Curated annotation (Swiss-Prot):
Propeptide section residues: 1-338
Family: Belongs to the peptidase C1 family.
Glycosylated residue positions: N70, N195, N272, N381, N486, N494
Cytoplasmic side: 1-34
Segments of this protein annotated with the region Disordered: 62-83, 104-125
Official protein name in the record: Vivapain-1
Lineage: Eukaryota, Sar, Alveolata, Apicomplexa, Aconoidasida
A GO biological process held by the record: proteolysis
SUPFAM superfamilies: Cysteine proteinases (SSF54001)
Biological function: Cysteine protease.
Cystine pairs: C360-C402, C395-C435, C420-C440, C489-C572
Source organism: Plasmodium vivax (strain Salvador I)
């Protein structure tokens, strides 16, 4: 037995191949499981619909009789409070209706003539009158802030804001109750007070526990200002929800996402106040938690050695067309002797505008398919085709669809099968159960795959064209909004992008020249932002990468990311795994 084990060739590549076979079998099992689940869900839904139709036909009369009672007791659109199963009571509904319907249109002083006063009310003394005037001025100022926040809100957003406001207040009340409890578990004041306050309107609800006293707790201006801080961030959150079409399953998830958004928003704001190399901005990742980022960015698949030997043609730099490899020094000086300082394939008209992979983990498909599009345009007089990422997601058996993959395996699929036109096989941002490449009328095929080492990147870009690279992404990378990224990365490669060029710029001109690519005109913008020159104003070197997070991310869908002069420092992993298609 020992002799048999020695004979077996358990090399690293063999183990990786064995691991891949196991992963492929799991993928097949998952597809079978999905089919079974869809079948079960279909039968279940049919049964539910049948039951509902039967129940509706039997209860038409009872629903008609009870309709008037339901309308008087609740407000449509306001969901139940999470956890207690109770609808908002009538007083709370009227309060929220007043705040989000009447208040924004009002501009009244709470001390005005429309405030009802007792007939026998005592005349205020001079000191009380001054305090009231000061409070009224503060209230008017806060009222203007409120109007600015909710001016552009739709009715749905105001309704959602009401829900969130209630949850925030409820949370603060629970915290206050815990602070007031003595060691024996008794409340010191024996009551719970909910304050919903805006200028010109104070609402107080007192819920007595043991004490039947109707004493009310006055609302301070500081409490009102704290409320407006929450309104400000909530307003930004709802703008984010509308822009990126976010919808959450319930108020609990919405509150959790709001918490993530506020934390990320403050991080972005703090970063932009200090960093001079790159800026962050709110984007589709702004409601992500650390756990969400870890789930979205998964480690790319490994490549066994035997597949590299079978398919990869190592890049061989040509020296003056003589077909000899360039001999490079440790500094890379000879390698870069005759290359330009700046190269941008967007300006050469062969780079498609960035697409959007959505919530599907298919970055590897977009990087590889985009690479094929560039190479085809380079060799066919700048004819840019739109090829199908969805075909590669569904049909490449060596990849795992939305669960991850690698550009290298996409190139292998293109060698063996070709890649379909995008119009024939449109992107769905999800795994189809079956490969549907029978739809394809025309395809682009490859002959082989090229491989590049980290110290050959600059020359390969000049001689070959754009190449596919893998990077280690963090939340810093995800929030990129412009400039030259030099933030934190991971050693684990978890995202694929397309490298389309490189450049250099003085530090003081990062946001002034060559800053953001204008996809409408096909030229670089100038003069967007500028910072004062520094005494030690050095040169900043960068790569230009095309991402797959839509043209609204980063600099119109692209990123400038830091590098050293030779381009071999593998910052963020650029240079560790580099491949390109050979037509």
């Amino acid at each position: 037995m020992a002799q048999d084990i020695k004979i077996m060739n358990l090399t690293k590549s063999s183990l990786e191949a064995l691991n891949r076979n196991q992963m492929l079998s799991k993928k097949s099992s998952r597809k079978i499981l999905k089919i079974c689940m869809y079948a079960i869900l279909t039968f279940a839904m049919c049964g539910v619909v049948l039951i509902c139709l039967t129940a509706m036909s039997n209860s038409d009369g009872s629903l008609t009789q009870s309709g008037s009672h339901n309308q008087s007791g609740s407000l449509k659109g306001l969901s139940s409070t999470p956890g207690d199963g109770e609808i908002l009571n009538k007083a709370e509904i009227e309060t929220l209706r007043f705040i989000f319907s009447n208040y924004p249109h009002g501009n009244r002083d709470p001390t005005g003539d429309d405030v009802e006063k007792p007939a026998d009310a005592a005349l205020p003394n001079e000191e009380d009158q001054k305090v009231k005037i000061a409070d009224a001025g503060k209230h008017i100022k806060l009222m203007k802030q409120y109007n600015e926040i909710v001016a552009d809100m739709s009715e749905d957003n105001k309704e959602q804001l009401a829900k969130m406001l209630r949850e925030l207040l409820k949370k603060k009340i629970n915290e206050r109750k815990k602070k007031r409890e003595d060691p024996n578990g008794n409340n010191e004041e024996g009551k719970e007070v909910i304050n919903i306050s805006v200028p010109s309107f104070n609402y107080k609800r007192v819920s007595a526990n043991q004490d039947d006293s109707d004493d009310e707790e006055e609302v301070s201006v500081a409490q009102i200002e704290g409320l407006f801080v929450n309104l400000k961030y909530a307003s930004k959150f709802f703008n984010f929800m509308n822009k990126y079409k976010r919808s959450y399953k319930d108020i609990n998830e919405q509150m959790e996402k709001y918490k993530n958004f506020k934390m990320n928003y403050l991080k972005i704001k703090k970063h932009n106040e200090t960093n001079q190399m790159y800026k962050m901005k709110v984007n589709q990742f702004s409601d992500y938690s650390k756990k969400d980022f870890e789930s979205y960015f998964r480690k790319l698949l490994p490549i066994p050695d035997h597949l590299k030997k079978k398919y990869v043609v190592p890049f061989s730099s040509m020296n003056n067309g003589k077909g000899k490899n360039v001999v490079t020094s440790s500094s890379g000086a000879n390698l870069l002797a005759d290359v330009p300082e700046i190269l941008d394939y967007r300006e050469k008209g062969i780079v498609h505008e960035p697409k959007d992979q959505g919530l599907c983990g298919s970055c590897w498909a977009f990087a590889s398919v985009g690479n094929v599009e560039c190479m085809y345009a380079k060799e066919h007089n700048k004819t840019i085709l739109t090829l199908s990422e969805q075909e590669v997601v569904d049909c490449s058996k060596l990849n795992f669809g939305c669960d991850g993959g690698h550009p290298f395996y996409s190139f292998i699929y293109a060698i063996e099968n070709g890649i379909c036109m995008g119009d024939d096989y449109k992107y769905k941002a999800m795994d189809n159960l079956f490969c549907l490449n029978y739809r394809c009328k025309n395809k682009v095929t490859l002959s082989s795959v090229g491989g590049v080492k980290e110290n050959e990147l600059i020359r390969a870009l000049n001689e070959v064209g754009p190449v596919s690279v893998n990077v280690g992404v963090t939340d810093d990378f995800s929030f990129y909004g412009g400039g030259i990224f030099n933030g934190t990365c991971t050693e684990e490669l978890n995202h694929s992008v397309l490298l389309v060029g490189y450049g250099q710029v003085q530090s003081s001109k990062i946001f002034q020249e060559k800053n953001a690519y204008d996809d409408a005109s096909g030229v670089t913008k100038k003069g967007a932002l500028s910072y004062p020159s520094k005494a030690d104003d050095g040169i900043q070197y960068y790569w230009i990468i095309k991402n797959s997070w839509s043209k609204f991310w980063g600099e119109n869908g692209f990123m400038r990311i830091s590098r050293n002069k030779e381009g071999d420092n593998v910052f963020c992993g650029i240079g560790v795994e580099v491949f390109y298609p050979i037509l």
